[in-house]
Amino acid sequence: MVTVEADVDQVERRLAAGELSCPSCGGVLAGWGRARSRQLRGPAGPVELCPRRSRCTGCGVTHVLLPVSALLRRADTAAVIVSALAAKATSRVGFRRIATDVARPAETVRGWLRRFAERVEAVRSVFTVWLCAVDADPVMPDAGGGGFVDAVGAIGALAAAIGRRFSLPTVSLAETAVAVSGGRLLAPG
């Protein structure tokens, strides 16, 4: 699986130009059909997702090109999931209140929060390393708010640093989280 931008036309252009590389061997990825279509629950309703599949011209391994709008093996868009994580970090309300705010079942939101809580130290450290790689003089997030707060703060600090470095008007917290984690922000391990 390879994480790519959400713009389908841009992904097709990059595939045709040979700009995507295989994570296994570094070879060039070429188009190879599509993965199965599925519907994600977005903030404003259902979102149809039919990710592109690619095949390495070097080693022959196939990869699904997952857009930064989705997390691996999740039925909701990254925007919904990351907004729930951010709500927990900033307001410190319970999972039922967050579930009501994002209009998702309470057990689903509790699962997201638990999975993220299991990984907060790994998430914080990975995003902090990326922050130092992107920004020569990074503004480090405040520490001491607890693991959950620190991990979400590291994601936010990296998103801000990417915006400054590449002169982007806004960099989504969700897209940053998906891009850096390779879609595996809530994956086991």
Regions found by a protein language model. Give the residues of each.
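Generic detector of leucine side chains in alpha-helical contexts
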Residues: 15, 20, 29, 40, ...
